[in-house]
Amino acid sequence: MIQATIRRSHDKGILSFEMTGHANFAEHGQDLVCAGVTAVVFGAVNAVIVLAGFEPLLDIGEDGGYFYFEFPESLDPEARQKAQLLIEGMIVSLETIERDYKDNLRVTTNII
């Protein structure tokens, strides 16, 4: 199962997110849940880089099964606002996948 953990501040702003595990919906290369989650996450992160104009802190597992995104502490408020909206859209998409594939994806939020 893919575990997606969203970390938010007390004011509900996104601080970071982490993805771990594998969907195990189908064989490697044929797993639609994995492909959907990967497309949503990489699409959102690429949009942040291009449209918000900054490089987030990223850690991507070499063999798959791990992805970490964190907002830099010093970030222009306008860029942060744009990126927050893009990542919120990613979360909506992940939760939509989770509704149909509960055994393969779990999205949780932690307030820190």
UniProtKB/Swiss-Prot annotation:
Its EC number is 3.4.22.-. This is Ribosomal processing cysteine protease Prp. Keywords: Hydrolase, Protease, Ribosome biogenesis, Thiol protease. CDD domains: Prp-like. Pfam families: Peptidase_Prp (PF04327). GO terms for biological process: proteolysis; ribosome biogenesis. Homodimer. SUPFAM superfamilies: TM1457-like. The active site is at residues 22, 34. InterPro entries: Peptidase_Prp, Peptidase_Prp_sf. Belongs to the Prp family. It is an enzyme of class 3 (hydrolase). GO terms for molecular function: cysteine-type peptidase activity. It comes from Bacillus subtilis (strain 168). An essential cysteine protease that cleaves the N-terminus from ribosomal protein bL27. The gene is prp.
